[in-house]
Regions:
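Mature catalytic core of soluble alpha/beta enzymes
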Residues: 1-344
Length: 344
């Protein structure tokens, strides 16, 4: 969810905002603002470093002063939730869970995210697993020290402590059954925080909402249904280019890819680790998921990346209200039929 240095921006900037929140604004800002003004609405957008990445909150609301206050409150909400769900900050509830192996009377937000994480682990047959943290730490330490992957025997040893089925979650306590286990919510918490922030902005009266948290994006508000946002999906072979544009009218989108945080130039080793084998998945280059929840899009894009094109695409087609695209290492694109309805 974040790096230790909050000022450091994550490289996981997979999607960019186009149309109203990106290219169209750069090319026609006056026209867009004129249309919003004539409707008696005001557009406010603010960018901050949060959750270890760039976060852009854009809203349209009836009153300018109120809109600015909404955006400030949105970042305050993110800060509060990050203080619960981060493993990188000291003395957060998640940090204490990893330190002790259990936490009594955990915050309800941590219970909710952990519970959902275990659900996605089950849905993906363990391809998404929040107990992968020890493997991530192993790879990070070896590449930082020697720019080389860890030896196989170390991977095999650490792999014994990775198993979502050894986590117990309820409102009274969260328990890790092995003393070697650690949890990372990096692949799900950012989406959860974005979801909660969008809901808060809707409750506050924002007409249109778009939040981009380093590629985890969510739209909301009645205005987004009537006038969807247009989002560009990056081409993993040429990350400065786009594979497609899709409309978000209340939906959420997330992408996982081997090019975002690669340990090696050939992308053989990257920041996504298969929790079942201990190595980076080798078949998919990028996975984009569009669904009704940023948390779900976040978790599923990671899990499907690990599952690979065949199993991952089958899962994507089975899930309700879920569309997406898988790009293989060979450059082939596999797109669900429903994504065409969202394409621009």
């Amino acid at each position: 969810m974040e790096h230790k240095d909050k000022r450091k921006v994550s490289r996981r900037q997979v999607l960019r905002i186009t149309a109203v929140a990106g290219v169209s604004l750069a090319m026609g800002t006056g026209l867009v603002r004129s249309l919003i003004s004539r409707a008696g609405l005001h557009r406010v957008s603010e960018t901050r470093t949060q959750m270890g990445t760039l976060v852009i909150v854009t809203i349209v609301a009836p009153e300018l002063k109120v809109a600015r206050e909404m955006v400030r409150n949105a970042f305050g909400q993110m800060e509060r939730l990050e203080g619960i769900l981060s493993r990188h900050r000291r003395d957060t509830p998640l940090d204490r869970l990893n330190e002790k192996g259990f936490i009594e009377t955990p915050p309800p937000e941590l219970v909710e995210v952990m519970g959902r994480a275990l659900t996605y682990s089950s849905i993906t047959d363990g391809a998404f697993d929040v107990t992968v943290a020890p493997l991530l730490e192993l790879y990070a330490s070896h590449f930082e020290a020697s720019n080389r992957p860890p030896p196989d025997h170390e991977v095999e040893r650490i792999l014994e402590s990775v198993d979502y089925r050894k986590v117990q979650v309820d409102e009274d306590a969260i328990v890790l059954e092995s003393s070697e286990m650690k949890v990372t919510l990096d692949g799900i918490a950012k989406g959860y925080i974005v979801d909660q922030t969008v809901r808060a902005l809707v409750d506050d009266g924002a007409e249109r909402i778009l939040i981009n948290a380093g590629g985890d994006m969510a739209s909301g508000g009645d205005g987004s249904l009537e006038n969807p946002w247009t989002i560009g999906v990056r081409d993993p072979a040429e990350p400065q280019g786009l594979l497609a544009n899709v409309r978000l009218g209340g939906e959420c989108i997330a992408t996982s890819g081997d090019y975002i945080q690669a340990f090696t130039h050939d992308r053989h080793f990257h920041h996504i680790i298969d929790p079942r084998t201990g190595y980076s998945p080798s078949q998919a280059s990028a996975v984009t998921v569009v669904t009704t929840s940023a948390m779900e899009a976040d978790a599923l894009s990671t899990g499907i990346m690990v599952l690979g094109p065949v199993e991952g695409f089958q899962l994507m087609k089975r899930l309700e209200d879920t569309e997406g695209m898988i790009v293989t290492k060979g450059g082939e694109s596999m797109t669900t039929p429903g994504l065409d309805n969202l394409a621009v």
